[in-house]
């Protein structure tokens, strides 16, 4: 069964809304791990709208599971990753005007640049995951740039408005997962997953880890982080 990476970006979103010092993402990560998180994920955006550089530096020293740093494939972010050395990096697309990450990274259209970044990071013993749509061409390109992981973008599945569409999107994810594993990639998934839709994705053969943030932080506002994480672990198990 898939493990759970808890994205704590929106703890920082609340903090940055008032430009204050609380709530503290580092404390949130500790509580998430106490609740059973198998990993902690943060996205250091170029505009620093939520997670800050200092957060990542502190998390590198305090996270006891593993730290997944989401970032754009820019020289600045590569330098930060090489300095901090997270347990692994997930390369994601990024637009300043977006509310959250929209769609997967286009590996096919920028294969030389992505290949260069993957090489730099993995030569420094930092495994790289690529956040992509489950398109056969994107999976093939991910193999070509020698990434260790892909993270399948589950947004269309999560946003499906009827059962027929949802099942079509799930089948698309399943096919992508199977193709990637056969090609030697390890497979994670995330984006838009909730307590109510997570199990079918978690149950896909070979799925390793689900990176989930917004729904857990929303639930945590009502019941606390530890309980919210425990409940997501139960949902992943289909309980």
From Swiss-Prot:
Pathway: Cofactor biosynthesis; pyridoxine 5'-phosphate biosynthesis; pyridoxine 5'-phosphate from D-erythrose 4-phosphate: step 5/5. The keyword Transit peptide does not apply. 1-deoxy-D-xylulose 5-phosphate binds at residues 9-10, 45, 50, 100. SUPFAM superfamilies: Pyridoxine 5'-phosphate synthase. Keywords: Cytoplasm, Pyridoxine biosynthesis, Transferase. It is found in: Cytoplasm. Its main location: cytoplasm. Coiled coil: none annotated. The active site is at residues 43, 70, 191. One of its GO terms (cellular component) is cytosol. 3-amino-2-oxopropyl phosphate binds at residues 7, 18, 192, 213-214. The keyword Transferase applies. This is Pyridoxine 5'-phosphate synthase. The lineage of its organism: Bacteria, Bacillati, Cyanobacteriota, Cyanophyceae, Nostocales. The gene is pdxJ.
């Amino acid at each position: 069964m898939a493990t759970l990476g808890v994205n704590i970006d929106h703890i920082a979103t609340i903090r940055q809304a008032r430009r204050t010092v609380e709530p503290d993402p580092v404390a949130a990560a500790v509580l998430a791990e106490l609740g059973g998180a198998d990993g902690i994920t943060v996205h250091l955006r170029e505009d620093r709208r939520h997670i800050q550089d200092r957060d990542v530096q502190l998390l590198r020293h305090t996270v006891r599971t593993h730290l997944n740093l989401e970032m754009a494939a820019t020289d600045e972010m590569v330098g930060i990753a090489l300095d901090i050395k997270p347990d692994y990096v997930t390369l994601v697309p990024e637009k300043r005007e977006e509310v959250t990450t929209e769609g997967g990274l286009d590996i096919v259209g920028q294969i030389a640049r992505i290949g260069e970044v993957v090489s730099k990071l993995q030569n420094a013993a930092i495994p790289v995951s690529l956040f992509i749509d489950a398109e056969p061409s994107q999976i093939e390109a991910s193999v070509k740039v020698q990434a260790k992981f892909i993270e399948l973008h589950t947004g269309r599945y999560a946003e499906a408005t009827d059962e027929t569409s949802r099942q079509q999107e799930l089948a698309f994810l399943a096919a992508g997962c199977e193709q990637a594993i056969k090609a030697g990639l390890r497979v994670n998934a995330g984006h838009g997953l909730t307590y109510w839709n997570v199990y079918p994705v978690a149950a896909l053969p070979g799925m390793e880890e689900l990176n989930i943030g917004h729904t857990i932080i929303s639930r945590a506002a009502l019941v606390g982080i530890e309980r919210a994480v425990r409940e997501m672990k139960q949902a992943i198990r289909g309980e």
